[in-house]
Structure formats: structure tokens, C-alpha cells
Amino acid sequence: MAALSVVCLLLAAASWRPVSASGEEFWPGQSAADILSGAASRRRYLLYDVNPPEGFNLRRDVYIRVASLLKTLLKTEEWVLVLPPWGRLYHWQSPDIHQVRIPWSEFFDLPSLNKNIPVIEYEQFIAESGGPFIDQVYVLQGYAEGWKEGTWEEKVDARPCIDPLLYSQDKHEYYRGWFWGYEETRGLNVSCLSVQGSASIVAPVLLKNTSARSVMLDRAENLLHDHYGGREYWDTRRSMVFAKHLRAVGDEFRSQHLNSTDAADKMAPEEDWTKMKVKLGSALGGPYLGVHLRRKDFIWGHREDVPSLEGAVKKIRSLMKTHQLDKVFVATDAIRKEQEELRKLLPEMVRFEPTWEELELYKDGGVAIIDQWICAHARFFIGTSVSTFSFRIHEEREILGLDPKTTYNRFCGDQEKACEQPTHWKIAY
């Protein structure tokens, strides 16, 4: 019996799961029905949203910041992060496709997210909490007086709202707002917090200044990372595994059009990200050049570090020759006219071009993920300066174990004199 107890203890130690402050284990994949008794009746809910103009890939970065806040809260109380439904993003411009109220499971693998922090979809929150009501909404903002030069000071204070609120009270004095496209959702109270610092700076406010069971942080992009580039950052980033159906589409495309498979490319992916720890440079990548060519608002802003199409193609051909690659995969947001021009300049380029039915199924966000997945598996990758789309590909390649020299590269502007290449943020386990 004693021996059996020792075995059980060893197994328990080997399979760590997040434990709440109350001592109860959190099990990934729990449904509302499973946990309605016990923890679910006591736990508190953290919700958040981001400035509407911000894109898909910046929002993924904000998730990492909020996840670190949740980990801080979990040291004291039972909390769960409610995933903000996707929708109404500036870059998602495909017509006639319904792209609001999109759950995270359309784009990411929820069991993987749950191995890092407890998360639930918004509709599960409604079911668990008793309705579409959020007890407290905090709108995060800077300080009206700005940051005074000198010593950096992390601080948070309840302050009058600087900008007009994007919430209005109805006749019942509930607050109506965007709320991710859920018109029936109401906020019971809305106030503003001025913040200057990392995400966990608001933890004392949530733990001590409010007893609200559900708290939403609007404009969460105003919070900084707790530990950018550290182990906690990478744990959360690694947990953001793309949805299995999108990875499968990307893998099929690699195989059919780019002669690329995990076995041939020396990739050793694990379905469980917590078990995946690879040496940088151990993966070879597929026999093609991966390219992210950002256009649209990047060129409208007359950025000096974005090349002309001719300049980009010249660099692409140079890289293909240097690395002896005869295939090139291009992910771009170029308008149709530029795409046609690019095709004339680079007739051999390969692109993932979904049918209307596929676009309706995967949506613009899913197509972006498929593009990133294919770029992440290339033998060599070159991206666009300061693009979060390219940054996310850098991270994905780092996770997959590709040589950093084949990852942290960007196009230079035609007249750019000092073309500084992206910084290597080394993965931490």
C-alpha cells in the first residue's frame, strides 16, 4: 500500500496542473456542468477588450499580458479568464462573411490554452454566471498629466475618464457598449483606471478594491508585459497552439504545393506543448522561401523601411539563389492590382488562396493563421519591418526549433540606409 502511495505521488508530481488558492485542482477541458458545483460557484471572472483599431496579431500579444495578470490573481483567489470573442477587425475585410462573435476555438486549441491558465469562452461565462451581465468594467487609460521624465514608476489610480466613454446607460441604468457584438450584454458599473506599468499592477485593485464577481478590463493594451521574453512569456506564447483544423489545412498545402512534410523537414512537433522542448537549429524547414510582404496601410504611411514590389522581388530572387530554393511562398495583404503585378514579377510564387467556401469556413483570421503556419515551416523566412504578423511568425519558428539566422530577417526599404534586422528573442523553457 505504501509503495502504491509513492507511485501515486510521483505520478501527481509529474503531471502538474494549475492549483487555485483554495487548493482545488483546475482540470483543462472542464465544462460548465462539470464544475458548476464547487469552484465555479466561487470563482471570479476576468474579461478584457482591446482598442477597436488594433489587429489580430497585436491582440494575441495582449492575451499574453492579461494571462500574466491572471497568474498573479490565482496566487490569491480562484479566477478564470473569459476569452474575448473575435470580430469587427479592420484587416478582416472579406465581404458577405459573418465575422463577429467568433469563439477562440475557431482559431486556437482551447485544451492547450488551458494547460497554462484556466480559460473559458464568453458563452460559457454567460451560462455559468447567470446571464450576460458584467459587474464591473474598468476602462484603462494613461495619466492625464502624462509621464514625467525621471524614474519610471509603476502606478494605478482611479481617475476621471479622459476620453468620452464608449458606453451609454439605458433606462434601467445598465451600461450598453460593443461587448464583442453581444448586444444583450450589459455592464452594471463603468469607471476609469489610469495605469502606468505591467499587467499585474492592477491585481491589488481586483483583489482589494472591488468585490465584483466579473470584472472587465477595457483597453487592456495599456498594460505592459510583466516579463517580456522570459519563461512565463514563452509558456503563454507556446500555449497559443493554433486550432487543429487550421494546422491540418496548412500541412496539407505544404505537402501538395511545397514538397514539405514534418519528417522531411526534420520537424518534431508535439501535440502537447508542455512536452515540446527543441534545440534551436534542430529543425531544417521545408524546401521553400517563406515571405511576409506587408502592404496596405504600411505603404500608405510612406514607411521608408517597406520596399517597392520590384525591390521586394529582387531580394526574394537573391535569397532563393543564396539558399538554393526554387519555391517561394508569399503571404501578403496587397490589394488585387498589386497582387497581379507581383504575379508578373514573380510568376513562380505560391500563395494560399482559399475558395469562397473555405474563406467562409476559416474566416480571415483562419486564413492569416494558415499563412503564418506555412511561413513558419519554411527553410528561410523574411518578413516586414515592425509588423506584428511577422513577429508572430518569428515566435512560431522559434518554438519549432528553426535556426534563428533563418528567422529574424526583414525587407529593407529601397532607399533605406541603415537596415537594422529584427532582434532575436530567444525562447525560454
UniProtKB/Swiss-Prot annotation:
Keywords: Carbohydrate metabolism, Disulfide bond, Endoplasmic reticulum, Fucose metabolism, Glycoprotein, Glycosyltransferase, Golgi apparatus, Signal, Transferase. It catalyses: L-seryl-[protein] + GDP-beta-L-fucose = 3-O-(alpha-L-fucosyl)-L-seryl-[protein] + GDP + H(+); L-threonyl-[protein] + GDP-beta-L-fucose = 3-O-(alpha-L-fucosyl)-L-threonyl-[protein] + GDP + H(+). GO terms for biological process: fucose metabolic process; fucosylation; mesoderm formation; positive regulation of protein folding; protein O-linked fucosylation; regulation of epithelial to mesenchymal transition; regulation of gene expression; regulation of secretion. One of its GO terms (cellular component) is endoplasmic reticulum membrane. Its EC number is 2.4.1.221. The keyword Signal applies. The record marks 396 as: Required for enzyme activity. Glycans are attached at residues 189, 209, 259. Disruption phenotype: Null mice embryos die before 10.5 dpc. At the onset of gastrulation at 6.5 dpc, embryos are rounder and the embryonic and extra-embryonic ectoderm appears thickened and disorganized. Expression of NODAL and WNT3 is significantly expanded and/or displaced in the primitive streak as is BMP4 in the extra-embryonic ectoderm. By 7.5 dpc, embryos are unusually dense and shorter characterized by a dumb-bell appearance. There is unrestricted epithelial to mesenchymal transition (EMT) producing an abundance of mesenchymal cells. SNAIL1 expression is expanded and E-cadherin expression decreased. It is found in: Endoplasmic reticulum; Golgi apparatus. GO terms for molecular function: fucosyltransferase activity; peptide-O-fucosyltransferase activity. It holds the Pfam family O-FucT. Residues 1-21 form the signal peptide. GDP-beta-L-fucose binds at residues 53-57, 292-294, 371, 388-389. Pathway: Protein modification; protein glycosylation. The keyword Glycoprotein applies. Catalyzes the reaction that attaches fucose through an O-glycosidic linkage to a conserved serine or threonine residue in the consensus sequence C1-X-X-S/T-C2 of thrombospondin type I repeats (TSRs) where C1 and C2 are the first and second cysteines of the repeat, respectively. O-fucosylates members of several protein families including the ADAMTS, the thrombospondin (TSP) and spondin families. Required for the proper secretion of ADAMTS family members such as ADAMTSL1 and ADAMTS13. PANTHER family: GDP-FUCOSE PROTEIN O-FUCOSYLTRANSFERASE 2. Belongs to the glycosyltransferase 68 family. This is GDP-fucose protein O-fucosyltransferase 2. The lineage of its organism: Eukaryota, Metazoa, Chordata, Craniata, Vertebrata. The gene is Pofut2.
